[in-house]
C-alpha cells in the first residue's frame, strides 16, 4: 500500500515538472508517514502541508522537491538548512549531498527530528538548536542555503554566508509570499521570483 502511494506521488511530482531523478528517487525512498503525527499518516502521500506540532508544518511534497531542485546541489555541496522541522526536507537533502547542516529554533522539534533521522540510518546530518536568522557562521561559506519558513525580509547574515555563486532559496513575505532564489555574485545578489507560496513565519530567537 505504501509503495503504491509513493509511486502515485512520484507520478504527481513529474506532472508538476519535477524531473531531477535523484530528487525523485530520494522522495520515493523516504517513508513520509514517519515524519507526521500518527493520526495524519493516511495523508502523508497527498500533496498537502500537514501540522507537526508547535505551530509548525511539514511542507507539501511538491514544494520540498521544487526547493531542493532550485538549490542545484552537487554531492560535495556545503549545505545549510534553516528550519529542521519534522526532518523530512533534511532527509531528502541528506540523500543528495555528503553532509547537511540544519538549524532549528524549537528544541523539541530538533530533538525529535534528530532521533528519527538516526532511526532511518541518516548519519550525514548535523543539527543545531539555534536562531535560524543567524545561519551557522562557523560552517560557512555555503554553496546552498534553504529556508523552510517565510521571512518578512531577507536575513543579511544568510546572504553573506553564501559562497561566490552560492544559492539561497527562501520564501519571503507575510500574507502574500513569494519563493525566491538568490545567487551571490561578489557583494551583489541576483534575485529570481519562482512562484507564490504559503509558509509558516520564520521567527527570530530560539525556544527551549
From Swiss-Prot:
Q: Give the location in the cell.
A: Cytoplasm
Chief location of this protein? cytoplasm
PANTHER family on file: PROTEIN-L-ISOASPARTATE O-METHYLTRANSFERASE, PROTEIN-L-ISOASPARTATE(D-ASPARTATE) O-METHYLTRANSFERASE
UniProt record similarity statement: Belongs to the methyltransferase superfamily. L-isoaspartyl/D-aspartyl protein methyltransferase family.
> Catalytic residues?
59
Keyword Oxidoreductase assigned: no
User: Which InterPro entries does the UniProt record give?
Assistant: PCMT, SAM-dependent_MTases_sf
A Gene Ontology MF term for this entry? protein-L-isoaspartate (D-aspartate) O-methyltransferase activity
The protein here is known as Protein-L-isoaspartate O-methyltransferase
List, in alphabetical order, the GO biological process terms annotated in this UniProt record. methylation; protein modification process; protein repair
Record-level GO cellular component terms: cytoplasm
- The protein's organism comes out as Aliivibrio salmonicida (strain LFI1238) (Vibrio salmonicida (strain LFI1238))
Question: Is-annotated flag, keyword Zinc-finger?
Answer: no
Q: Taxonomic classification, please?
A: Bacteria, Pseudomonadati, Pseudomonadota, Gammaproteobacteria, Vibrionales
Instruction: Describe the task this protein carries out.
Output: Catalyzes the methyl esterification of L-isoaspartyl residues in peptides and proteins that result from spontaneous decomposition of normal L-aspartyl and L-asparaginyl residues. It plays a role in the repair and/or degradation of damaged proteins.
Keywords for this entry? Answer: Cytoplasm, Methyltransferase, S-adenosyl-L-methionine, Transferase
Against Pfam families, the record matches this protein to: PCMT
- As recorded in UniProt, its EC number(s) are 2.1.1.77
S-S pairs: none
- Highest taxon above the source species: Bacteria
Name of the gene: pcm
Q: Which reaction does it catalyse?
A: [protein]-L-isoaspartate + S-adenosyl-L-methionine = [protein]-L-isoaspartate alpha-methyl ester + S-adenosyl-L-homocysteine
Entries under Gene3D superfamilies matching the protein:
Vaccinia Virus protein VP39 (3.40.50.150)
Amino acid at each position: 500500500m505504501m509503495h503504491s502511494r509513493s509511486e502515485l506521488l512520484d507520478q504527481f511530482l513529474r506532472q508538476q515538472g519535477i524531473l531531477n531523478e535523484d530528487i525523485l528517487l530520494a522522495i520515493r525512498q523516504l517513508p513520509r508517514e514517519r515524519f507526521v503525527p500518527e493520526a495524519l499518516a493516511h495523508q502523508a502521500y497527498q500533496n498537502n502541508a500537514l501540522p507537526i506540532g508547535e505551530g509548525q508544518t511539514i511542507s507539501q511534497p511538491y514544494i520540498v522537491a521544487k526547493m531542493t531542485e532550485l538549490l542545484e546541489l552537487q554531492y560535495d555541496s556545503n549545505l545549510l538548512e534553516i528550519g529542521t522541522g519534522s526532518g523530512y526536507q533534511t532527509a531528502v537533502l541528506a540523500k543528495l549531498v555528503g553532509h547537511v547542516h540544519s538549524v532549528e529554533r524549537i528544541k523539541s522539534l530538533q530533538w525529535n527530528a534528530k532521533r528519527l533521522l538516526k532511526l532511518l540510518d541518516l548519519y550525514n546530518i548535523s543539527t543545531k538548536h539555534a536562531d535560524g536568522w543567524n545561519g551557522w557562521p562557523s560552517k560557512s561559506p555555503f554553496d546552498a542555503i534553504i529556508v523552510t519558513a517565510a521571512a518578512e525580509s531577507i536575513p543579511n547574515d544568510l546572504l553573506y554566508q553564501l559562497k561566490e555563486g552560492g544559492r539561497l532559496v527562501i520564501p519571503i513575505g507575510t500574507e502574500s509570499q513569494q519563493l525566491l532564489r538568490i545567487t551571490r555574485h561578489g557583494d551583489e545578489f541576483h534575485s529570481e521570483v519562482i512562484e507564490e507560496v504559503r509558509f509558516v513565519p520564520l521567527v527570530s530567537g530560539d525556544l527551549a
